[in-house]
């Protein structure tokens, strides 16, 4: 029987069949962790040298070899072998080829269990910084757009029906606030990613006199995990990221859904740049909002990664199980998806054309000013419920007569209630309706300008 040549093969008599090897290998995707695997190893071997577990000479030689591997990796000169299963074994084999048997001492006081957890913490910690940078850019684009459209009036909707006229900037600031909370969630995610698993070993720690705080400091983590079982067995920091990413994608998807509607012939509220639209292979006139549709579609993809990992984790006993190999691809794909989606959405918003006249016109052909009349009557002392009923009858009669509220004469309006006077026509104007809603957080122009000013100050403080 052929000898098992795996680095862990001493206990085995038989060899692994090629097809089984392919099924179990993860190098096709976990090579994304290569840089972080080397960085983690550099910190580990430096700690081994400083604590006397390895001699300083041994530590230095291993560090030189690892740094050479890092240079070759960055130059695209490393080749990985599926026979070595994963990025950790591949790197150890490559290091052995470079410096000989001394490479075997690198794994002293370390397991692949704490090694892979460390790699993923390092990877996600870096990526969260990129996500937050792109979110900050998107929020800046939104603020610039909102600042230019405080006085642009559009219909506000409930149930996709015209409800009340609002400032377009007010609508944009609603999304700004959603994205701001997304930023805060990712910032909190950073706290849980900023923990160092290195030194937890397989599950129970190690008998070697390691210095876990030193390893943590060298890798610029805030602190080590305080429980070795927890360090190697949980992936809640990834689940938290996937959850936050799902909420972010949901917010982007809702925004894209609205832009898809707004650029349709029925709305014509906005015109998207050619850069973010696609033509039809058969219909020459088409200009389809494909990029917005793709963000909307990719939202389901990110949801899938969240539920996939939740399902992987739901029945896992402590500590490490091979199921955890399935924690990586969804994380990698989600990172790529949200970074690209943030870029595309920011690009669409910074280049879109707002058709102010269409938005304004849409508020003049509906009954979204009906609440103004009800508030007007309530302000004159009529109980709001009674005012609501009066205006409801007027709206019904207006529909039957093909009129808008402002089309009725004063005498006709007064047949509905004597409290209505000449000044009602000012109140029924969409601009007045918007301007008067100056309660905190409302759509009144002063309030919207205040919201923008506060948001810009907060955004600047983050830079």
From Swiss-Prot:
Keywords of the record, alphabetical order, are: Amino-acid biosynthesis, Arginine biosynthesis, Cytoplasm, Lyase
CDD domains found in the cross-reference section: Argininosuccinate_lyase
UniProt cross-references to Pfam families, sorted A to Z: ASL_C2, Lyase_1
The gene name reads argH
* Top-level EC class: lyase
Family named by the database record: Belongs to the lyase 1 family. Argininosuccinate lyase subfamily.
Q: Which GO terms describe its molecular function?
A: argininosuccinate lyase activity
Query: What's this protein's name?
Result: Argininosuccinate lyase
| One GO BP annotation of this record | L-arginine biosynthetic process
Tell me the organism. Streptococcus pneumoniae (strain 70585)
Pathway-wise, it operates in: Amino-acid biosynthesis; L-arginine biosynthesis; L-arginine from L-ornithine and carbamoyl phosphate: step 3/3
GO cellular component term, pick one: cytosol
Record's subcellular location:
Cytoplasm
Provide the reaction this enzyme catalyses: 2-(N(omega)-L-arginino)succinate = fumarate + L-arginine
For this protein, what is the EC number?
Answer: 4.3.2.1
**Coiled-coil ranges per the record?**
none
């Amino acid at each position: 029987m052929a000898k098992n040549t795996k680095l862990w093969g001493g206990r085995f008599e038989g060899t692994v069949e090629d097809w089984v090897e392919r099924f179990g290998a993860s190098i096709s995707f976990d090579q994304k962790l290569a840089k972080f695997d080397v960085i983690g190893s550099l910190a580990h071997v430096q700690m081994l040298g400083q604590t006397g577990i390895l001699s300083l000479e041994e530590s230095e030689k291993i560090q030189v070899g690892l740094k050479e591997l890092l240079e070759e990796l960055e130059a695209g000169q490393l080749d990985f072998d599926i026979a070595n299963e994963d990025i950790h074994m591949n790197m150890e084999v490559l290091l052995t080829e470079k410096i000989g048997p001394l490479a075997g001492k690198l794994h002293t006081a370390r397991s692949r269990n704490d090694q892979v957890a460390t790699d993923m913490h390092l990877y996600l910690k870096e990526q969260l910084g990129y996500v937050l940078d792109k979110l900050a850019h998107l929020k800046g684009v939104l603020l610039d757009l909102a600042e230019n459209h405080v006085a642009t009036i559009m219909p506000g909707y409930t149930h996709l029906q015209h409800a009340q006229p609002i400032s377009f900037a007010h609508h944009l600031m609603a999304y700004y606030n959603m994205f701001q909370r997304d930023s805060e969630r990712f910032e909190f995610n950073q706290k849980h990613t900023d923990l160092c698993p290195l030194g937890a070993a397989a599950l129970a720690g190690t008998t070697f006199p390691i210095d876990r705080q030193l390893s943590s400091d060298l890798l610029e983590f805030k602190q080590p995990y305080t429980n070795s079982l927890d360090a190697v067995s949980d992936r809640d920091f990834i689940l938290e990221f996937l959850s936050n990413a799902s909420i972010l994608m949901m917010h982007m998807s809702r925004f894209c859904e609205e832009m898809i509607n707004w650029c349709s012939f029925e709305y014509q509220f906005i015109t998207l740049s050619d850069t973010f639209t696609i033509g039809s292979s058969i219909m020459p006139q088409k200009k389809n909002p494909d990029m917005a549709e793709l963000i909307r579609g990719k939202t389901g993809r990110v949801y899938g990664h969240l539920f996939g990992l939740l399902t992987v984790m739901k029945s896992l006993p402590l500590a490490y199980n091979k199921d955890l190999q399935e924690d990586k691809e969804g994380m990698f794909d989600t990172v790529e998806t949200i970074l690209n989606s943030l870029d595309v959405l920011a690009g669409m918003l910074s280049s879109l054309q707002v058709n102010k006249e269409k938005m304004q016109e849409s508020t003049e052909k509906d009954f979204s000013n009906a609440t103004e009349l009800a508030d007007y009557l309530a302000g004159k002392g009529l109980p709001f419920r009674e005012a609501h009923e009066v205006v409801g009858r007027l709206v019904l009669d207006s529909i039957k007569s093909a009129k808008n509220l402002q089309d009725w004469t004063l005498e006709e309006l007064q047949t509905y209630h004597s409290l209505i006077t000449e000044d009602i026509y000012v109140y029924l104007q969409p601009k007045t309706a918007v301007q008067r809603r100056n309660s905190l957080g409302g759509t009144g122009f002063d309030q919207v300008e205040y919201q923008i000013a506060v948001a810009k100050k907060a955004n600047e403080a983050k830079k």
